[in-house]
Amino acid sequence: MSFSEQQCKQPCVPPPCLPKTQEQCQAKAEEVCLPTCQHPCQDKCLVQAQEVCLSQCQESSQEKCPQQGQEPYLPPCQDQCPPQCAEPCQELFQTKCVEVCPQKVQEKCSSPGKGK
């Protein structure tokens, strides 16, 4: 029980892709990880922290992200999202963009003048 308790007590470690936003990431990861990852500790904590950390600190760490982390860390929505949609999606719709980018984002980003 000691081993599990010590691991759980430790804060969620953000991905190695946020060197500049580590402080902000840790705060967000702790809030989401500690209460939700107290049971599965690190296994689930890391996944949850990465998802929250990336969506929140990605725009800032996007440039600092290494080539290896860019592919898995960057949302698969940027490729499908048009340039007009990627800008607003990165600021407010980052988390939602990854989930339903081609549907919700396009509708919100698509201007009434351009159909595509």
Swiss-Prot record:
Name used for this protein in its record: Proline-rich protein 9
Gene that this polypeptide is encoded by: PRR9
